[in-house]
Every structure is written in structure tokens, then in C-alpha cells.
């Protein structure tokens, strides 16, 4: 995985693909506005194949997300949105029958999905819930985390031989971007409960596979392309699920992170923005001297040095060539002397 799929001529990343599963923040929008070229590129994609939106956000329902996307100009309905609470429901149904009482940490996104499937919702451990589903909401505080711990420890605490009731987390994002900066995410809150109960939850969201499997099942497709801005969730998750992946450099991870990506987190395609979905993607070629060529750019790893043989147009093809050369070398990037120009 990672730029090494067999390709002998330049075709678009959508060649042979029957659906696109796009992340939201950093791919479709940033803050209140859409990212340049995202809306028109995704609407164009939808004219030819399925487009789904995969989000770890557990605080909003699919209808709420779809309304936001439609306001940005996207052709979208609630069924196009796959949320981590929806993926969590399938995990829950495998463990607890509908009609059971479920303790919830989180907001509208989780409660809506539970009620759709006939589960009853509680916020009290004293009511004897059959399972705990934990997701993020800005108002979640110590009281909710403590109550979840009491529910999980009621039948199977740290010193118990009992397995305890099922505990499902929508996602394990350690941080989330908000208007004022980076804030603790659901993974941080799950970790707090873990400290009190001595075990880990089953996780539904990226980079775990249930959310990708839910999307594939819903759209009835076989060869989706996952598009995301984070290597540690979008790309890692796509690779784990056996799906093609493209990282777009409009969000969290940029050139430096992509160059340093470990084998499990390497994308098949590197795009500046979503216009790249519809543009021919250059072939990656390796010359006899070991130099990797992408377009007019050529990069070689010489011992511990990364050498720019030709920077071509000095654009994205240079980054693509450098990634392929570094990844093929098998050497961790911290052990290499990398030209600073590759990071810009």
C-alpha cells in the first residue's frame, strides 16, 4: 500500500473505483466554510458514482450533518452520511438485543441512533443498563464519566472475574479541532473511564474497521476510495479495511507527516485538493540508479541522505517522488537527512 499499486499509465484516482468515502473536517470544510474546490469536485464525483461522508463525530445526527453539507452546496441526503454512532449500533446489536436499556455518554448523535433501533436510553448507572455506549459531546463532564464507570463496574470491575457489560466507544480521537484551537477529544474521555474500570471498549470509528464496513455495506460497493486529511485515522483505517486511500493536503497532515508515514498509514494517492480526484495521477517509476521519478521530479535516497535529483516543477510531484523514495528505502525518516524544501 502507498503509491505502489500497479499502474503503467496516468489515470485518475477514480479509475476502477465505485464509491468515494470522504472525511469532513479538513476535507470538505474548515471552520464554517467549505474548502476550495471540495464542493464542486464531490458533486461531480456523485454524478458518476456513490459518494458517502464518514465522520467520527458522535455529537450530531446524520440529518444534522447532511443539512450542514447541503448548506455548503453539496448534493447530499442523510443516508449519505455514515457516523460513528451508526457503526457503534451494529457492534451493540451483536452484543445486546434491541429493547435493552443502554447507558449513554454523549449527545444527540448516539441517542438518535439508539432510539431508531428500539433501545431505551438512561443516564443513570442505578437503573442497571445492559451496555454502555460512549461518544463525545462538549457538555460531557466528570459526572457523566463517573456514572459510566459505576455502570461498567457494577458487574465486572478491575478486581472482578466477571467480564462486565459491553462498552462501546464511538471513536478514540485524542484531540478535536475547535474554533479556539485543539481540544481533548473522545479518546481522552474514554481513557479517563478506562482508568477507573481497568478495561478497554470496543471501538466503532476510524481508524477501526467497523465504520468503513458500515459504509461499504450501506452503499453496496466493492472498490471504494477513502479520502481524508489524517493519516492516523482516515488512511490507517482505509488500509486496515482493505480500501484504496487518498490523503488531501487541506487539513491536519501536511508534507512532513506524509513523508514520515509508517507503512500502515501510507496513502495510495497524495492530492493538493479534491480537484485531484478528476486529474490524471502520474505514474511512479524507479530508475536503475534507484532514483524515483514522478512527472519531471526525481528523488533518490543515497545512504542517509535524501537527494533531490530534479525538483521538476517544484510542486506536488516532488513530494510524491520523495515519499516513494523514502518509503522504498525502508529507513525511518528521523534517521535521514531530508532537504527542508520537501517540508514546505
Model-derived features: where do they sit?
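Conserved phosphate/oxyanion-binding catalytic-loop motifs
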Residues: 57
Amino acid at each position: 500500500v502507498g503509491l505502489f499499486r500497479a499502474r503503467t499509465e496516468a489515470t485518475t484516482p477514480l479509475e476502477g473505483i465505485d464509491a468515494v468515502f470522504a472525511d469532513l473536517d479538513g476535507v470538505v470544510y474548515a471552520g464554517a466554510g467549505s474548502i476550495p474546490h471540495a464542493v464542486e469536485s464531490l458533486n461531480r464525483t456523485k454524478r458518476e458514482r456513490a459518494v458517502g461522508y464518514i465522520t467520527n463525530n458522535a455529537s450530531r445526527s446524520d440529518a444534522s450533518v447532511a443539512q450542514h453539507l447541503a448548506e455548503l452546496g453539496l448534493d447530499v441526503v442523510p443516508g449519505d452520511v455514515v457516523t460513528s454512532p451508526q457503526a457503534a449500533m451494529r457492534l451493540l446489536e451483536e452484543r445486546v438485543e434491541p429493547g435493552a436499556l443502554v447507558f449513554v455518554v454523549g449527545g444527540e448523535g448516539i441517542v438518535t441512533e439508539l432510539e431508531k433501533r428500539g433501545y431505551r436510553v438512561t443516564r443513570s448507572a442505578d437503573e442497571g443498563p445492559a451496555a454502555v455506549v460512549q461518544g463525545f459531546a462538549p457538555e460531557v463532564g466528570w459526572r457523566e464519566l463517573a456514572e459510566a464507570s459505576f455502570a461498567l463496574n457494577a458487574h465486572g470491575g478491575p478486581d472482578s472475574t466477571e467480564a462486565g457489560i459491553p462498552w462501546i466507544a464511538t471513536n478514540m480521537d485524542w484531540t478535536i479541532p475547535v474554533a479556539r484551537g485543539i481540544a481533548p477529544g473522545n479518546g481522552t474521555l474514554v481513557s479517563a473511564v478506562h482508568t477507573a474500570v481497568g478495561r478497554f471498549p470496543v471501538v466503532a470509528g476510524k481508524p477501526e474497521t467497523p465504520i468503513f464496513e458500515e459504509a461499504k455495506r450501506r452503499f453496496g460497493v466493492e472498490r471504494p476510495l477513502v479520502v481524508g486529511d489524517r493519516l492516523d485515522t482516515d488512511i490507517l483505517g482505509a488500509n486496515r479495511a482493505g480500501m484504496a486511500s487518498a490523503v488531501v493536503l487541506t487539513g491536519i497532515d501536511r508534507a512532513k507527516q506524509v513523508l514520515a508515514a509508517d507503512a500502515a498509514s501510507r496513502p495510495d494517492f497524495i492530492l493538493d485538493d479534491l480537484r485531484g480526484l478528476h486529474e490524471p495521477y502520474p505514474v511512479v517509476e524507479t530508475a536503475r540508479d534507484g532514483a524515483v521519478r514522478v512527472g519531471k521530479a526525481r528523488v533518490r535516497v543515497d545512504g542517509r541522505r535524501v537527494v533531490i535529483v530534479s525538483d521538476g516543477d517544484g510542486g506536488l510531484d516532488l513530494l510524491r517522488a520523495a515519499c516513494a523514495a523514502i518509503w522504498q528505502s525502508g529507513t525511518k525518516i528521523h534517521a535521514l537527512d531530508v532537504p527542508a524544501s520537501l517540508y514546505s
